Amino acid sequence: MIGRLRGILLEKQPPELLIEVNGIGYEVQMPMSCFYELPNIGEEAIIYTHFVVREDAQLLYGFNTVKERALFREVIKANGVGPKLGLAILSGMTASQFVASVEREDISTLVKLPGVGKKTAERLVVEMKDRLKGWSAGDLFTPFTDAAPVDSGSTSSNSAEEEAVSALLALGYKPVQASKVVSQIAKPDMTSEQLIREALKSMV
């Protein structure tokens, strides 16, 4: 099992990245709440990974800390929640927000996440509340900040908007919804990561 990667960040295409380790490039999918904290392209990154083997693919999901990965592993233990939905859940809200929503049994907030209906939200609360009991979000997970993300290298506002829409589609949002939200919040000087962050905030 691949549990940790340390290497040079080659590409950032939210929610995916490419990291080179000893001459080998690894494609990794990462929740946007973690993606914002990545270093610049060309710099060294350390990523904790969850390895998934399927009949048709081998997938890596990446996180900045062991604690964030631990939460992801707890999320995908819930009935009906796979890695793809787990990625969407932890992109739509931060680790601390998710823990708080489960502890408060806040179904109305959870159902705003892509792919999460009322039944899935209820299962998340029922199955995870006891497992999260006593877990302090502040102690367990990297706090989410409003610090400006690094420039993802977008060459124009149009390409930034296209990348943002593509990222939202990859997370499970519908094309019309993704395009509408991005167009509403887009400003000429915004990077794709800033657009994604603001879009996700507006939809939860």
Curated annotation (Swiss-Prot):
Annotated spans, Domain III: 156-204
Main localization category: cytoplasm
CDD domains, alphabetized: UBA_RuvA_C (cd14332)
Keyword DNA-binding listed: yes
Stretches the record annotates as Domain II: 65-143
Gene Ontology biological-process annotations: DNA recombination; DNA repair
Pfam families noted in UniProt: HHH_5, RuvA_C, RuvA_N
Listed transmembrane segments: none
Family, similarity comment: Belongs to the RuvA family.
Function (record text): The RuvA-RuvB-RuvC complex processes Holliday junction (HJ) DNA during genetic recombination and DNA repair, while the RuvA-RuvB complex plays an important role in the rescue of blocked DNA replication forks via replication fork reversal (RFR). RuvA specifically binds to HJ cruciform DNA, conferring on it an open structure. The RuvB hexamer acts as an ATP-dependent pump, pulling dsDNA into and through the RuvAB complex. HJ branch migration allows RuvC to scan DNA until it finds its consensus sequence, where it cleaves and resolves the cruciform DNA.
Domain notes: Has three domains with a flexible linker between the domains II and III and assumes an 'L' shape. Domain III is highly mobile and contacts RuvB.
HAMAP family recorded: DNA_HJ_migration_RuvA
NCBIfam families to which the protein is assigned, alphabetical: ruvA
Protein name in the entry: Holliday junction branch migration complex subunit RuvA
Gene responsible for this protein: ruvA
